[in-house]
Amino acid sequence: MSDWDTVTKIGSRAGPGARTHVAKTQSQINSARRAGAIVGTEKKYATGNKSQDPAGQHLTKIDRENEVKPPSTTGRSVAQAIQKGRQAKGWAQKDLSQRINEKPQVVNDYESGRAIPNQQVLSKMERALGIKLRGQNIGAPLGGPKKK
C-alpha cells in the first residue's frame, strides 16, 4: 500500500485507545486499576515557587501574638516628685518648661504620670529642679560633684 491510498485525518489522535487522564484522587487511581488501564504514579516536585519569605513568617508570628503591650509610662512617684520640686522653687509648669527648653504639654504629661519616659527630658528636669527622678531614691536631692 502506498502513501497515496492512506487517508490523513487532521486533529485525530495517533494510535488507538482513550486519551491519557490524570487521576487526582486515590479512588480514581483504584478504579483505573480495576478497569485494567495502564497506571503510572509519579509525584510532582514543583520547587520553583516554594521559596519562603522570612519577613512574611515574622509578620505572621507578630499577628498571632494577641497581646498588645502599651508603652510604659512614668510612675506616680516621679509625677509627685516633679510637682513637689517645682512648687518648692515656686515655678509654674510654664516656667519649668522654659528652663528645660520643652513644651508646657511635656511637663504636664510628666506631672500627670502619662508620659513615656525620655532620659534626656528627665535629666533636664533633674538638673533644673535639683532632685532625682530616675533610679532609686526618687525625690531625693541631687548630690553635687564628687569631692576628690
Curated annotation (Swiss-Prot):
Disulfide bonds: none
Positions of the HTH cro/C1-type domain: 82-136
GO annotation terms (biological process): maintenance of translational fidelity; positive regulation of transcription by RNA polymerase II
Domain of life (superkingdom): Eukaryota
Molecular function GO labels: DNA binding; transcription coactivator activity
UniProtKB keywords: Activator, DNA-binding, Transcription, Transcription regulation
Pfam families the UniProt entry points to: HTH_3, MBF1
Region Disordered, residue ranges: 1-97
Keyword DNA-binding: yes
The entry's DNA-binding region: 93-112
Gene Ontology CC terms, in alphabetical order: cytosol; nucleolus; nucleus
Annotated Gene3D superfamilies: lambda repressor-like DNA-binding domains
Family per similarity comment: Belongs to the MBF1 family.
Biological role stated in the UniProt entry: Transcriptional coactivator that stimulates GCN4-dependent transcriptional activity by bridging the DNA-binding region of GCN4 and TBP (SPT15), thereby recruiting TBP to GCN4-bound promoters. Involved in induction of the ribosome quality control (RQC) pathway; a pathway that degrades nascent peptide chains during problematic translation. Required to prevent stalled ribosomes from frameshifting.
Protein name (record): Multiprotein-bridging factor 1
Source organism (scientific name): Schizosaccharomyces pombe (strain 972 / ATCC 24843) (Fission yeast)
Encoding gene per record: mbf1
